[in-house]
């Protein structure tokens, strides 16, 4: 753990000493300027309003960013499953032999992981229902739940309860608030600009089901083991006052983005070739004028030249998908309900 704190100190010093570059090199390097970071943040907030720009305390402001756009934040992002639980499920899936003799791959293991998450959610719902029912034990609560004789809902109108809000308030007042599933955690997520790597940088601050801040070791439980000792650092969030966070080191972000851009460009070019072959084939069948199809090639180049290319303002949306692989139990999809 001492090594992580030393790395944090070195990282902070490097951020302070690195000069700011305003020259755009995104398409060549995958890096972005502060201005491009702001544009990407505006796009993220527009598409997914659960993310918001935030100012920083006066002493923490960075003069190369607008005062009201110092960092991005989304709060109360749920996490029901620890990273180790995901990894255990994935290993089990890889070991299972299918009927035709081949072994499940990482891609195929997504389904059981999602099921595991749904199981945890159902557990959370049952836990709350049983606790609020006044059951003295989970077993008693489950028996009450199963024996309640609730009828099947056949009409959407049956889901509407005009007194539900009042009932919830009354229950909360009588019980001192809803009791949460002890396995559930919530995270506040922050994205700021890294001057040393010229890419976004993610910070996470976690809380348990009672709202108590998680320790660094507890937050590490939500980091995939492959990244835990390589790309994750414990440090004080430099844009907040005395807040311990876990940061995801941005050293590979630019390279990942560059690879993704190459793949997107290759896919766009392959699609263009397929489309051209299709037009040519149709022309040979007499359903189109082959000469006109050839003449339209230049027009297609103008209109489709940027098709499939990742735009710089889309950076943070892609960035979050990369970060999700580092913290598989944190439900980033929750922050993208507006999509």
Swiss-Prot record:
GO terms for cellular component: cytosol; phagophore assembly site. Keywords: Autophagy, Cytoplasm, Protein transport, Transport, Ubl conjugation pathway. Residues 255-314 are annotated as: Handle region. The active site is at 251 (glycyl thioester intermediate). GO terms for biological process: autophagosome assembly; autophagy of mitochondrion; glycophagy; nucleophagy; protein transport. Residues 86-182 are annotated as: Flexible region. It is found in: Cytoplasm. GO terms for molecular function: Atg8-family ligase activity. Coiled coil: none annotated. E2 conjugating enzyme required for the cytoplasm to vacuole transport (Cvt) and autophagy. Required for selective autophagic degradation of the nucleus (nucleophagy) as well as for mitophagy which contributes to regulate mitochondrial quantity and quality by eliminating the mitochondria to a basal level to fulfill cellular energy requirements and preventing excess ROS production. Responsible for the E2-like covalent binding of phosphatidylethanolamine to the C-terminal Gly of ATG8. Belongs to the ATG3 family. The N-terminal region is involved in phosphatidylethanolamine-binding and is required for ATG8-PE conjugation. The flexible region (FR) is required for ATG7-binding. Monomer. Interacts with ATG8 through an intermediate thioester bond through the C-terminal Gly of ATG8. Also interacts with the 40 amino acid C-terminal region of the E1-like ATG7 enzyme. Also interacts with the ATG12-ATG5 conjugate. This is Autophagy-related protein 3. It comes from Pichia angusta.
